[in-house]
Structure formats: C-alpha cells, structure tokens
C-alpha cells in the first residue's frame, strides 16, 4: 500500500475533500469546497509524490503515493479549483446586479433648497411682507401660484442639460499578414469559418416525373353538370347515354370486320376531340383529300366541331347530338362523361316497410287475436235486507258465543206493550210519587252532610267534595242512552199498526230544583292534610297534596289557601327553579 488510510478520511484527512471530488463518492457542499486551500494542497501532493514527507512514527519508511492515487488527487484539485472559481463568478455577478439596481433607483426626496419653488406660496407671509396689501393701487389683492418649470425639477435637470452621447465606431485593425518564415499551424480547437458560419437552408426541390401530364382544367360545362344534380333533363340524358353505351357494347362483335378501313378516320376524330391540338385536325383533313368515306360518315360534313375545341366538355346549349350510326360504330372515340355521385339510399331488408291499410283492417276483423272482454255476471241476489243485517252482525262463525249472545240480546225487537205510552195515572199515584221524591231528596242531603264531615276528618284522601261526586254521577246517569237505538224503534214500528190516540193531559208547571249550596274548602282542612303528609313524608310538594288529574277549581282553591297560610307564617312554600315543584315546609308558627 502506497498511502496511509488516515490521509483520505473525511473531516480529518488532508486529502479527503479532494478524493471525494475526484471520485464523486458523495455530494459536497459549498462550505467544504471553500475550505480547501488549493496552493497548500498542491504542495502537499508534490511532497508525497517526491517522497519528502516524514514518516508518522520513527523507524518506518516514508509514505509514498501510487500513480493512480496521485492522478486522482490531481483531478480532484482541478475540480475543487473549478468549483471555487464558479462560486467566485456567481458572487461577483450577484454584487454587480445589486449595484446596477441601486443605480437605477431614482431619488424621490426633494432637497430643502428646492421645496419653496415647488410649493404654493404662503399667503400669510406674503401679506406680512407686502403690508397687508399686495399692489392695492393696481387692484391686485392676491398672487397666483406659478407652475414649476421642468428645468427646476431636480430629477431630470441633469438629463436635460447633458448632451447626447455620440456612437463611437470601432476601427477595424488591418489584418496581420502571416509571416512566410513561420509555417501555418492550425490548432485542433480552432475550426474553419466555413464550418461555423450559418448557411441558409436550401429550398426543397420537387422531383420531375418523366411523362407527367397536367390534368385538364374543369370547364364551365363540367361545373354546370356537377351542380345540376337535381335537374330531371340531365338525369334523362344520362339514362339515354347509358342505353346507347349498352347498344354499342352489343354491336362491338358485329362491327369488328368494318373497323380496319376506318382506322385513319378514328385517329382524326380522336385528335379533333382532344382539346389542345385543333390545328392537327385540319392538317389531317388536308393530307387526305382523296379518301373515300362511307355514306354513313359523309353525313357528318354539316357538323362543325371546331367551335367546341376550346373546352374539354362543351356547354349544354352548344351540344349537338351526333347521328346514331356514327356513335354505334365509334364507341371508343367519345370521351366518358364524369360520373355523377348519386345520393346514398337506405337499404331495407323488407321490400314493404309498412303494412297496407286494407291488410291491417283485414287482420283486425279476424277474431282469432281480438276476443271480446267477458263481462262478469253478478249473482242474482247480492243485496240483503236491513232486517237480515241486524240479525247477523258479521259472518257466521266469526264472533265468539259471548259476544254473539250480547248482540242477539240487544238486537231483540221490544214488545208492543212496552212501546206504547203509559196510560193516564190517577191523582193518588201522583201524590205517592211526589212523597217518594221528597224522601229521596232528604236522604241525599243527609248523605252529602255526612260525606263533608268524613272528608274533613280524613284529609289524606283526594280533596273532592261529595256534592261534586253526586253531581257528576247524576250527569253520567243523564248522559247514558238506552241500549236500544231509536232507529230500531222506527224499523220495528213500520210493520205494526198505529196505536189508538190517547187523550191529551194538561201541562203541569215545571218546578225548578234548587241545588244545595256547595261547602267551600277551609284552611283548617288543608292544614290537617299538610300535617298528615309531613308526618308520613319528610318532604311535601304541591303535586302530592293535589293530584294532577284533580279539577282546576280545586287546585286553585288549595293554592290560595297555601298562600294564606304562608302569609300567616304557618307554612313555607318555596320553589327553587322556574316551573319546578312547590315545596311545602312547616313555618315558625306551625302547631
């Protein structure tokens, strides 16, 4: 080994950064590049290569570097030095940009000497200087502010006063003539001016094709033929031409023997029909003066095709029909007309896409597909009489026997004797009934007094008066209706004869019944009830004293008596939160 490992260790070895820069083992930062002293590092590398470095321990040989290591260290020094130069150039460029931006800034603060000329005049100071009357004899009482002159603006004064710099032309130095004594040595890095000079791109040239012919231009007749697609005359003409072409094809095998003597004639007609050579046709006609034409061809002497040679396809108004015999014998000489694009037609698989009306009606008349809707015939007897409905409440077998017995008992029609009015009673029976009513009234009064006393003695029960109970019971008895509804009476009376008329009785005057006065609840009864509740329970509230389902009048009466007892300091009524329970506690004067 020609070097020690501690030389290349990172952060400790003297060649660690150079070794990493040469081998690119890891990424280096700017601080590591700038920490390398290039001059000192080069001297140390030279000392190691020339074996001038002392051994770290006495007695050991001097450290040496191999050729590979010395080459790698030299490459590393070059890369570190190049990166340091890059950092230096970037810093200089950054500083120059800052200086340039600082020079471009315009001074916006005005100097104190320029402020008075740019501000409005102080009227108070002018009045003091002019003794309160600036030129009073000439009628001038104020001084208008003057606008500042552009030459007084400090920002652009130096720009207006400075002269425009002239453009200096660079003098071209004469080219130095090469010394003939010195041989021409062209460096490998220098290229010739022809190589580095930009040249214009050559235009793309189209290759010429031999035998290429330009297509004839579309004439006016062709355009009219293409535009007039909906014209019926053109369609008919095309059909006629199609028929003529079919006839020509059929007549070709018959006329093969006659085509040989007409070869020259066909060549002349072809040249006559081609657009660019009208003169050749005349030359051919003059060169063959003694040619004998058949009688069919001599008929074409009256037709002048020279007027149609200027266009490829002649217009429609100048087109003259040729004799049928010539067209039959010269099928290949006529120029094929451009095919007209037909409109795209929809193809249907079925020839008849819609059924005819007669066939449709015929299919509707057949009864194999359209049957009449069968009308459901109801049974002959669907409705039941009211008597049958009253006798049978529901379907048989649905009601249990107990309910069915009650229904049959209530559904019985009353007898006739019960429905008749009671006969005229005698005076004795009336007096007996009055005596019985008085006895019953006395008994009810005695019972009501007893119930009031019992309620006072037993206040733990609900605070409801016996009279109220008796009245409610009487109202319930009055509100009860008879088990037999009046409709049944009407149904039962329909089928029976009317009862005989009874004599009218004189109306008796109604005696109003005076209800006994209801005894009001006293505070002593409320106090007893509260005392009994407090003995049973430690805490007592208003809801336990008066049940929630008690009458409103009773609740208001008890609440009023509680307020009276609280004012007398016998009871204390408290409510801790709104809408909370009313707590009832004994007061200071509670017995």
Curated annotation (Swiss-Prot):
Expressed primarily in the gonads. In the testis, expressed in pachytene spermatocytes and in spermatids. Not expressed in spermatogonia or somatic cells. In the ovary, expressed only in oocytes. Low levels also detected in a number of somatic tissues including thymus, lung, liver, kidney and small intestine. SUPFAM superfamilies: Winged helix' DNA-binding domain. Phosphorylated. The keyword Phosphoprotein applies. Belongs to the rad21 family. The lineage of its organism: Eukaryota, Metazoa, Chordata, Craniata, Vertebrata. The keyword Phosphoprotein applies. It comes from Mus musculus (Mouse). Disruption phenotype: Mice display a high mortality rate, both during embryogenesis and after birth, germ cell failure and sterility. Mutant females exhibit ovarian dysgenesis and lack ovarian follicles at reproductive maturity. Affected males have small testes due to arrest of spermatogenesis during meiotic prophase I. Early chromosome pairing appears normal but synapsis occurs between sister chromatids rather than between homologous chromosomes. This is Meiotic recombination protein REC8 homolog. Interacts (phosphorylated and unphosphorylated form) with SMC3. Interacts with SYCP3. Interacts (phosphorylated and unphosphorylated form) with SMC1B. Does not interact with SMC1A. Interacts with RAD51. Forms a complex with EWSR1, PRDM9, SYCP3 and SYCP1; complex formation is dependent of phosphorylated form of REC8 and requires PRDM9 bound to hotspot DNA; EWSR1 joins PRDM9 with the chromosomal axis through REC8. PANTHER family: MEIOTIC RECOMBINATION PROTEIN REC8 HOMOLOG, SCC1 / RAD21 FAMILY MEMBER.
